[in-house]
Curated annotation (Swiss-Prot):
Keywords: Cytoplasm, Methyltransferase, rRNA processing, S-adenosyl-L-methionine, Transferase. It is an enzyme of class 2 (transferase). Belongs to the RNA methyltransferase RsmE family. Its EC number is 2.1.1.193. The keyword Cell membrane does not apply. It holds the Pfam family PUA_4. It catalyses: uridine(1498) in 16S rRNA + S-adenosyl-L-methionine = N(3)-methyluridine(1498) in 16S rRNA + S-adenosyl-L-homocysteine + H(+). GO terms for molecular function: kinase activity; rRNA (uridine-N3-)-methyltransferase activity. Coiled coil: none annotated. The keyword Hydrolase does not apply. This is Ribosomal RNA small subunit methyltransferase E. Specifically methylates the N3 position of the uracil ring of uridine 1498 (m3U1498) in 16S rRNA. Acts on the fully assembled 30S ribosomal subunit. GO terms for cellular component: cytoplasm. It comes from Synechocystis sp. (strain ATCC 27184 / PCC 6803 / Kazusa).
Length: 303
């Protein structure tokens, strides 16, 4: 299904086209195949939800509210049907009781203040729409060469907190990890937890892995600034390059595996329009580089 949605402030809105698939046995975790053209958001919400009163987010009313991401299909009119796991989390972990409030997010920009109202049937009532904007002003997709072990988990949690729009795992010539379907599902759960904690409106999808060759073929386009983090090359610093460039509709940034990109991979990426950039004179670990790069982009976009 082709999904479109809006992101950005009232003065700057962009769109992202994304193809979503569903993991086997799961219907509530959208997985993006790849984010290409920028521009995000129209949700298929019912009129009764859209007509809920809108309240601007205030620190006094919402700063301590617990947040829960639900699938859009769990919301019918103004009622949220919770899964068994979600109800257990609210009741047993957070110790919420009937009548207690929390925040509901649909992962696609919708945020509501809700009240737990029927424990027997596991439902909550949406009370009002919350207007807030915590997303980056333009989409940033991180394409990450899969590190060994649990390294990818170390990357996606802080990068979700920093505002990454989507994650594209890469299989490179030096990649050792070949993830299973269970790994993909676990990664999406970690992203969901981080999105709830960091008060994101959008749930960054974790795509199915692509080979490096498949990836560079998909990225090309005049609306995309494609960046390749490299070492030991005479490349401009990431921050300096971004300051000198006209900001595009979206940014796609790729970071390499342990041992770095091969010469063939660097040449292929440059031939496909990627700009090599440096993160500094020091050699960063594969699990460190994505967070450092996104933090630099974040600081520039939000300054």
């Amino acid at each position: 299904m082709l999904a479109k949605a809006f992101a950005g402030s009232k003065s700057h809105k962009i769109l992202i086209n994304a193809w979503f698939t569903t993991l086997p046995g799961q219907c509530q975790k959208p997985i993006v195949q790849f984010v290409l053209s920028p521009i995000l958001v129209s949700t298929n919400l019912t009129p009764s939800i859209l007509s809920l009163p809108v309240q601007e987010k205030s620190s006094s009313s919402f700063v301590m509210a617990y947040r829960l991401v639900v699938a859009p299909e769990q919301i019918i009119e103004a009622t949220v049907t919770l899964t068994t796991a979600q109800l257990h989390y609210l009741q047993r972990v957070l110790r919420l009781q009937k009548g207690d409030g929390f925040m509901v997010l649909d992962g696609g920009g919708g945020v509501w203040r809700a009240q737990l109202n029927d424990l027997a049937h596991g439902t909550a009532q949406l009370l009002e729409t919350v207007s807030e904007q915590n997303e980056l002003p333009l989409p940033v997709t991180l394409a990450i060469a899969l590190p060994k072990g649990s390294g990818f988990e170390e990357i996606i949690r802080p990068c979700t907190e920093l505002g990454a729009t989507a994650f594209q795992p890469l299989l490179t010539e030096r990649t050792l990890l070949k993830p299973s379907q269970n790994k993909l599902e676990r990664w999406q759960r970690i992203v969901t937890e981080a999105a709830e904690q960091s008060e994101r409106q959008w749930l960054p999808p974790v795509a199915a892995p692509l080979t490096f060759g498949q990836f560079v073929e998909k990225v090309a386009g005049p609306e995309t600034l494609a960046l390749l983090c490299v070492t030991r090359l005479n490349s401009p610093m990431l921050g300096a390059y971004l300051k000198q460039s006209n900001l595009p509709a979206q940014i796609v940034l790729a970071t390499g595996p342990e041992g770095g990109w091969t010469d063939n991979e660097i040449s292929l990426a440059i031939a496909k329009g990627f700009q090599p950039v440096s993160l500094g004179k020091r050699i960063l670990r594969a699990v460190t580089a994505p967070t450092v790069a996104l933090a630099q982009i974040n600081a520039l976009l939000e300054s």
